[in-house]
Design a protein with these regions (language model features):
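An acidic/histidine-cluster motif and surrounding catalytic segment
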Residues: 1-100, 104-263
Length: 263
């Protein structure tokens, strides 16, 4: 009899005061019989410029060329929360993990997709929820044409355009270490770190269509700001590199991570 592969630990990024969000995501995970752990998120209300300097140095407080502005306190808090998980994975010698933010909806297929990925451990990073300048969260970012069946309608393939959203992804500890090095000094939001993962040396894949989407009930009250606000500036560069001809080549598998160069 084949023994089912162990699922990676699921870390839910959640602030202590975000009780409604915690209940929202906990109920969904319980409904799919998935164990999880709440990772105490850094609260932007607890951050001061002095604290940020002590934790991250001066760079995080400076205007960022690609953004055209400083990082917001919410973006810094979110980035720190994801960094903490990457470091914990290394400290605790985990093989891999799933990172979930608390303001998402899990599709009924989420658990089955995770089990299928766990049964075939060959990916460094897989975006479970994502969107792009071209497509919304129910379609997801563009991926290469060569796709492997994961479960039902869901396929996994290399990402070939800037994927927005760090709200749901699988990552190995080796890839998490590369992302942590790439993220410092902090100069970009968390979903730029994941979106431009190829620049850190990580082979990035995505599930299409995504099996996790932003929860509409929480979109208006995001602590970070609009999920697309930070990406809007960066996508001017993405579009220059990502014209239709270049995208077509990347979809065929020719340098699919080329969109991330320069970040």
């Amino acid at each position: 009899m084949t023994v089912p592969a162990a699922l990676p630990p699921i870390f839910v990024v959640n602030m202590a005061r975000s009780v409604e969000r915690r209940a929202h995501i906990a109920a969904q995970l319980a409904a799919q019989s998935l164990a999880f752990e709440i990772h105490p998120a850094v609260d932007a209300r607890d951050l001061s410029e002095k604290t940020i300097r002590e934790l991250l140095g001066e760079v995080a407080l400076q205007p960022q060329p690609f953004l055209g502005r400083r990082l917001t306190l919410g973006e810094i808090a979110c980035g720190l929360s994801h960094l903490q998980i990457y470091r914990r994975m290394q400290r605790d010698h985990l093989d891999d993990a799933v990172v979930l933010e608390d303001d998402v909806d899990l599709l009924p297929s989420f658990g089955s997709v995770l089990r299928a990925l766990a049964a075939e451990p060959r990916f460094e990073m897989v975006l479970l929820g994502h969107h792009s300048a071209r497509h919304g969260p129910y379609v997801g970012a563009e991926t290469c044409l060569y796709r492997r069946i994961v479960h039902g309608e869901h396929r996994v393939a290399r990402v070939c355009e800037f994927a927005m959203g760090a709200y749901a992804y699988f990552v190995t500890t080796g890839a998490a270490a590369q992302l942590a090095r790439y993220a410092e000094p902090m100069r970009m939001p968390a979903d730029w770190v994941t979106g431009y993962a190829p620049s850190s040396g990580v082979r990035q894949h995505a599930i299409t269509p995504p099996c996790v989407v932003p929860a509409r009930r929480f979109c208006e009250a995001s602590e970070i700001g609009s999920r697309d606000a930070a990406a809007a500036v960066g996508n001017r560069t993405t579009r220059r590199l990502g014209g239709r001809a270049f995208l077509a080549l990347r979809k065929l598998g020719f340098f699919p991570g080329l969109y991330s160069k320069g970040f």
